[in-house]
Design a protein with these regions (language model features):
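A short, well-structured juxtamembrane/interface segment
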Residues: 106-117
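Class I S-adenosyl-L-methionine
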Residues: 43-46, 53-69, 73, 77-101, ...
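SAM-dependent nucleic-acid methyltransferase catalytic core
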Residues: 1-8, 13-68, 278-281
């Protein structure tokens, strides 16, 4: 099932200002049933975010301080890798289907109840990626603000002209909606799109819309504090959990797809050297 990751899964995390590669050398066993896994001080759940009981079980009576999430809009992408096959050895065929072009606006798989599930957490700070594609689904969206992620610039603001994949696939920036009315800001985190971060080797990624851990760290450091309970109801690649582990936050994460929930757990285990504990559903 995880044949796409036969060489090893990876991501980069920010450790003392440097990038550390995280490798997963073996294929983890996929958990098909809904479970909650304790990866102290975090929790990872295979369940749907629209199930209020499942979310309540995940939170275990605690309240979210900050929500950072990237909902599954556009997962049925219409994508053609034919011109880049020499660079893209293997695509995640489960979620990236062959076609003509990348269509980030394809949001058939995203529904209003998913947005409401995030807002129901009632966190002081809530950040939702891709909301510019489904803004009409967000109630009172004008009460919030948008933050720009500039993928081409480093922290000093210098734009580096290179051959990053986002010149061919996707865009050089993304927008994140904030529930709070923050001042206009730009997260400058260098990213080479589908090929990974500049510091990473040209390897396969673990998720089609994966966010770099350095980007998650940018938000957690600016809008949160150590010890915060951070919630991500659409865990995806698990970058939010890894950033929380690095920065002393408590993560509560949910992922609908058992495949990616397994990847998240494997990444956490590789980073910490600890073993996740499966709790009763």
């Amino acid at each position: 099932m995880l044949k796409e990751y036969e060489d090893s899964l990876y991501n980069a995390s920010l450790v003392d200002g440097r990038v550390e590669l995280l490798y997963i050398d073996e294929e983890p066993e996929v958990e098909e049933e809904a479970v909650i896994v304790e990866v102290e001080p975090a929790a990872d759940s295979v369940a749907t975010p629209t199930d209020a009981d499942a979310v309540a079980k995940l939170m275990n009576g605690e309240r979210a301080d900050l929500v950072f999430t990237d909902p599954p809009y556009g997962m049925n992408l219409d994508t053609d890798y034919s011109s880049m096959q020499s660079k893209l050895a293997i695509a995640d065929e489960k979620h990236l289907k062959g076609g003509n072009k990348y269509d980030a606006g394809h949001v058939d798989d995203f529904t209003p109840d998913m947005v409401q599930a995030v807002l129901n957490l009632d966190a002081k700070e809530t950040f939702i990626w891709g909301a510019d594609y489904f803004a009409e689904l967000i109630p009172n969206r004008n009460d919030g603000s948008f933050i720009v992620w500039d993928k081409r610039a480093n922290e000093s603001g210098t734009i580096e002209q290179d051959e990053s994949s986002d010149k061919m696939f996707g865009s050089c920036f993304e927008l994140c909606w904030s529930k709070a009315k923050h001042k206009r800001d730009i997260a400058r985190v260098k990213w080479a799109g589908i090929f990974g971060m500049e510091q990473e080797p040209d390897r396969k990624r673990v998720h089609p819309t994966q966010k770099p851990i350095a980007l998650v760290a940018w938000f957690l450091n600016r809008y949160g504090k150590e010890g915060d309970i951070v919630v991500d109801l659409f865990g995806g690649s698990g970058s939010t959990m890894i950033a929380c582990e690095q920065l002393g936050r408590k993560c509560r994460m949910m992922e609908l797809d058992p495949h990616y929930c397994t990847v998240i757990i494997a990444r956490w285990e590789k980073l910490t050297g600890q073993k996740a504990i499966k709790l009763n559903p």
